[in-house]
Amino acid sequence: MYGVLAHYYSFISSPSVMVNFKHHNAVQLLCARTRDGTAGWERLTHHASYHANYGAYAVLMATSQRKSLVLHRYSAVTAVALQLMPVEMLRRLDQSDWVRGAWIVSETFPTSDPKGFWSDDDSPMGGSED
């Protein structure tokens, strides 16, 4: 999409272990239910305790009492800053009631994993909460 290439992966951690958890697409990653308003998106950004921008690479960490989610994003958050998003999409964003950061992620993440991003050893939904 307009030169924006977004790769994603996350780590789910518990007090004893941090494991790689593969998500099939951005919707699975951000929200287990359909886009039914702001509530499903606010949970991710509301609990964000760390957010850093490194050029075209960004990190978001969402935490709760039980687990942490570390999300590495390439060109997702910086798409607006680098003016990589088309004007009509920016207009929709400005008129939206949705959480700005989550909206950008949902619009710029790929719907499937890039070829070769995961090794052959990775399972489609590997990992555990323990």
From Swiss-Prot:
Tell me which GO cellular component terms the UniProt record holds: host cell nucleus
A single Gene Ontology biological process assigned to it is: symbiont-mediated suppression of host type I interferon-mediated signaling pathway
Q: Name the source's superkingdom.
A: Viruses
User: Which residue ranges does UniProt annotate as crossing the membrane?
Assistant: none
Outcome when changing L30A:
Complete loss of host DDB1 binding
Q: Which GO terms describe its molecular function?
A: ubiquitin-like ligase-substrate adaptor activity
Keyword DNA-binding appears in the UniProt entry: no
Question: What's the effect of swapping R33A?
Answer: Complete loss of host DDB1 binding
Q: Which UniProt keywords apply?
A: Host-virus interaction, Inhibition of host innate immune response by virus, Inhibition of host interferon signaling pathway by virus, Inhibition of host STAT2 by virus, Interferon antiviral system evasion, Viral immunoevasion
Protein name per Swiss-Prot or TrEMBL: Protein UL145
**Subunit notes for this chain?**
Interacts with host DDB1; this interaction promotes STAT2 degradation.
Function recorded in the entry: Plays a role in the inhibition of host innate immunity by exploiting host DDB1-cullin RING ubiquitin ligases (CRLs). Mechanistically, recruits host DDB1 via a DCAF-like interaction motif to antagonize IFN signaling by STAT2 degradation.
Q: What organism is the protein native to?
A: Human cytomegalovirus (strain Merlin)
Q: Which gene encodes it?
A: UL145
